[in-house]
Regions:
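Juxtamembrane intracellular "pre-TM" segments in multi-pass secondary transporters
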Residues: 3, 7-27, 209-307, 502-513
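Helix-loop boundary and gating motifs at the non-cytosolic
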Residues: 8, 12-81, 108-111, 118-121, ...
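Hydrophobic core of transmembrane alpha-helices in multi-pass small-molecule transporters
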Residues: 35, 39, 108-109, 116-137, ...
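Glycine-rich segments within core transmembrane alpha-helices of 12-TM secondary carriers
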Residues: 71, 75-81, 150-181, 185-189, ...
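Conserved MFS/SLC helix-loop-helix module at the cytosolic interface between two early adjacent transmembrane helices
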Residues: 79-118
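Helix-to-loop junctions at the C-terminal end of transmembrane segments
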Residues: 80-94, 175-179, 354-372, 453
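C-terminal ends and interior cores of transmembrane alpha-helices
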Residues: 101-117, 129, 202-204, 378-394
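Symmetry-related core transmembrane helices of the 12-TM Major Facilitator Superfamily/SLC fold
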Residues: 185-205, 465-484
Length: 514
């Protein structure tokens, strides 16, 4: 007679399947995979030595070709695909774009290794622009597969691991170059292997069931507490402070949202998933875009947010231009064919010090709403001084030091700006403002590139370029210094008026008798 009870092997197999299922449903599983992808996709030992590689015997390109014909393509590519990739990322629910980013990064590295000539390198820069635009999928993916209460930890891990990858790549590249352990081409082969690992890891990521705009979580229940309305799809009114971020670490702190989300997950086991998700069809895509436009207008109706966003766009534009072309300046000051260079070590130090600066700013007790604009102007001025010293001193160690100082100042200020902007926005609106500010920075960067750098424009050499960048930050400093001084003067005037009003309105002395 056949036994109806499961055998020992069947029980063990069932336990293993349950264990695997439990691990995959835990928030650590997608976070770990994403961090592995983020690490291997950012370890690039050759990146600090890209100019010596392109202008050396491997590619035989001139500095003018790299500066005026090849590098500008990245800016144009990035601008042209940023908005389509941003919308497509949400439409296909993140993972396909993460995989696509890994594929294009692999193609970029392969072209850098095997392709030759200016047109081929321009095509390589185009693909790298697509890689950069696809970065939005990396930072957005994790929010669609974990609970709201895990946002801060997951964001911290995913951003920190990228910084670790860049730092490890820079240090590794410096060691390989300084000790003559590997040629530039072999370093690219090594990078290709790491990119292949990142590609395989991206394929293992779980597919999200929801997204921020086109596949929202749907529920009929809406809760209101103390006049603040919160919805189970994760959106909240703009008046609620739902994001407490040090370096754009988004975390919704509303308790009702967390409870409703957890309740949905428990009830979701007994209900059809189609009831929990509201997928936007083709007819509703226009409605989503209209809603995005309404949110955009409402976000930028705040004058304070506009000031911070203007600085964000202006400073990010100048920062990107400086970082993109700083290796050309280093090569001009001290050609790599003559002496040893330490680009990798400088990049590693700048990354670590920038991270420490951005982290430390979160523990400073300052009223940024009052003193923030003055800080933006003052530290932007220091950044301009660093750029002027890099441009005119003509010493490689001054260039290295100025670059580290400039990068630390920018990272500190962009952290303050991110926090101030995020303080009164829901996650969806913060993502919208974040994308709009970066798009504005990219438009400005494209204008500067086409006029100043491109061979079809002025095609200036590197010293006039950096003179313009330093002057650019000087203008930013003057504007925000004046604005900051005005803000402080107005705050003190309002305080005096309030004090005078309180004194004049206070009742006379009344004697109290027992």
């Amino acid at each position: 007679m056949r036994s109806e009870f499961p055998t020992r092997k069947q029980v063990e197999k069932q336990k293993k399947m349950e264990t695997v299922k439990r691990l995959k449903s835990d928030w650590r599983y997608p976070t770990t995979l994403l961090c592995i992808y983020g690490f291997f996709s950012t370890v690039k030992p050759l990146e600090p030595f890209l100019i010596p590689f392109l202008t050396g015997s491997d590619k035989n390109l001139t500095t003018e070709q790299v500066n005026n014909q090849i590098f500008p393509v990245w800016t144009y590519s990035y601008l042209s695909v940023l908005v389509p990739v941003f919308l497509l990322t949400d439409w296909v629910r993140y993972k396909p774009v993460v995989v696509f980013q890994a594929i294009t990064l692999f193609v970029t590295t392969a072209m850098l290794l095997w392709a030759n000539g200016v047109p081929a390198m321009q095509a390589m820069q185009f693909f790298y622009g697509v890689v950069t635009a696809s970065e939005v999928a990396y930072f957005s993916y994790i929010y669609s597969v974990i609970d709201l209460k895990r946002y801060r930890k997951a964001t911290s891990y995913s951003r920190s691991i990228q910084l670790l990858g860049y730092t490890v790549g820079s240090v590794l590249g410096q060691l390989l170059v300084s000790l003559n352990l590997m040629s530039y081409r072999n370093m690219l082969v090594f990078t290709l292997v790491l990119t292949g690992i990142a590609l395989l890891t991206s394929c293992l990521l779980p597919m999200p069931q929801q997204s921020m705009f086109f596949h929202r979580k749907h529920t009929r229940q809406t809760t209101t507490t103390e006049g603040i309305e919160s919805h189970a799809d994760g959106t909240v009114d703009a008046t609620e402070r739902t994001i407490r971020s040090k370096v754009s670490l988004e975390e919704t702190t509303d308790i009702n949202v967390e409870k409703s989300t957890e309740k949905e997950k428990e009830e979701g086991k007994n209900t059809d998933k189609s009831e929990d998700l509201e997928t936007v069809g083709g007819e509703s895509c226009g409605q989503v875009l209209v809603q995005l436009w309404r949110d955009f207008r409402q976000c930028y109706s705040s004058r304070q947010l506009i000031y911070w966003s203007v600085w964000w766009a202006l400073a990010t534009c100048g920062y990107n231009q400086t970082v993109n072309y700083v290796q050309v300046l280093w090569e001009h000051v001290q050609p790599s064919q003559n002496v040893s260079i330490y680009n990798g070590g400088v990049e590693a130090v700048s990354n670590l010090m920038s991270a420490a600066t951005a982290y430390g700013i979160g523990f400073t007790e300052v009223r940024w709403d009052q003193w923030g604009e003055l800080a933006l102007g003052s530290f932007s001025g220091l950044g301009a001084v660093a750029l002027f010293l890099m441009t005119f001193i003509g010493n490689i160690w001054v260039c290295y030091t100025g670059y580290i100082v400039f990068k630390c100042l920018y990272m500190m200020l962009i952290t303050i700006a991110m926090y101030q902007i995020a303080a009164d926005l829901s996650m969806e609106r913060y993502a919208l403002v974040f994308g709009a500010n970066n798009f504005g920075a990219l438009v400005l960067q494209t204008i500067i590139t086409s006029v100043v750098v491109d061979s079809r424009g002025l095609a200036l050499s590197i010293i006039p370029q950096f003179t313009i960048y330093a002057s650019y930050f000087s203008v930013i400093a003057v504007v925000f210094l004046l604005r900051g001084l005005f803000t402080i003067w107005r705050a003190k005037r309002n305080k005096r008026e309030t004090t005078s009003s309180d004194i004049s309105d206070s009742p006379g002395f009344v004697e109290h008798r027992l």
